Amino acid sequence: MAAATRVEGAGSAGGGSESARVLIYSHDTFGLGHLRRSRAIANALVTDRPGVSVVIISGSPVIGNFEFGSGVDYVRVPGVVKLPNGDYRSLNLNVELDEAVGLRAAIIQQTADTFGPDLVIVDKEPTGFRGEIVPALERLKERGTRIVLGVRDVMDEPALLVPEWERKGAVDALAAYYDETWVYGLREIYEPLSGLALPGEVRQRIAYTGYLRRSLPQEPGFMRYPKSTKGPFILLTTGGGGDGDDLIDWVISAYETDAGLDLPAVIVFGPFINRDRRRSFAERIARHPKLDAIAFDTKLEYLMNRATAVVAMGGYNTFCEVLSLDKPALIVPRTSPRLEQYIRAMHAERLGLVRMLVDDEAERDPARMAAALRALPAQKRPSQVIVPGLLDGLDVIQRRFAGWLAERPRRIAISEAAE
């Protein structure tokens, strides 16, 4: 009876069966990708649903810079940051990592207890960072909360993903706590969990949604873009910027070497770029008439929509934006410490959606990049390739959410009848 009472009372913010509370745990130890994906899903869930409230839990230091839809808010936990050697440390607090994780876990559990979500969506990590969400998952499961794991289209190559998930107890957690797994991609492109020894019932609960379509935001009223954006230009984005130094350097070198490149380039550094590297890049850019740069743009979709073509590393969110805004794209994926971007770019190039240029340090020839940039504007757009369901991700999530909302009264009635 307790579970039935909780579900009936959970949606106090709105009316009828459309009232619901959703908690999203956004993995946040590196870059912007997880936060931006969680934000897109949260905004979709509250669209035309005034009774739905979504809380995002994140440790991202820039979450406050983003706009969220009505009904969406966030709780920021103390941040952690991934170091170049693969270790982690507390981002701002002068405490040991274990203490920071303990504090994060306590805030997560308190938020879950107080907010009382009907649905929980966990991004990427079934146990969270260092197992921090497991205590909350145990209590949520006892209350009958529906729990979903959401993963991007590509995690990593199986040889690395399998031991990582074994070490974290991720498969056991997936079987114990989760009702569904949503893959934000297409099975025809890649199966991110195929190498894992998942129980049959877990594998049956995997749903492929398609990629998450991005809509065009309103024009930023406070953002001043370079003059070069008033005409045709190439946009270079490395996402958060924490690992995009080599690509930025390669593109700048191409312009410095080849005066015949027609289109100017606008480079978005990202908020996590190394300060010294950014200063060095800015000096080189200032000396070149066809190069401009901006630090960071929370409405990158607007700038990308104005661009003629895009150069990027091919993280999940940028890939979704390239597809949604239908831009010819040159993807230069990183190949360490994960092969995620390379695998995505390889399969996307196979379908003709993008062109890939592998960043081999030994062959990082400016002339090679210049040739790729010169060919980019004439490259076909993603929409010229027909892939059914390619950008249906948010629509599928909304339909599954709506179906679950419609089923709740029936499930409550069954629960009460059983009592």
Q: Each PLM stretch: what is its role?
A:
Residues 19-21, 26, 44-99, 103, ...:
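Conserved nucleotide-sugar phosphate-binding/catalytic loop shared by glycosyltransferases and other
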Residues 2-10, 14, 366-419:
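C-terminal amphipathic helix plus adjacent low-complexity
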Residues 196, 211-309, 362:
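Donor-nucleotide binding loops and adjacent catalytic segments primarily
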Residues 152-246, 272-275:
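A nucleotide-sugar donor-handling region in carbohydrate enzymes
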Residues 26-39, 63, 244-245:
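A short, glycine/small-residue-rich beta-strand->loop->alpha-helix junction that serves as a flexible
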Residues 299-343:
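A donor-sugar binding/catalytic signature common to diverse glycosyltransferases
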Residues 109-175:
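Conserved nucleotide-sugar donor-interacting segment of glycosyltransferase catalytic cores
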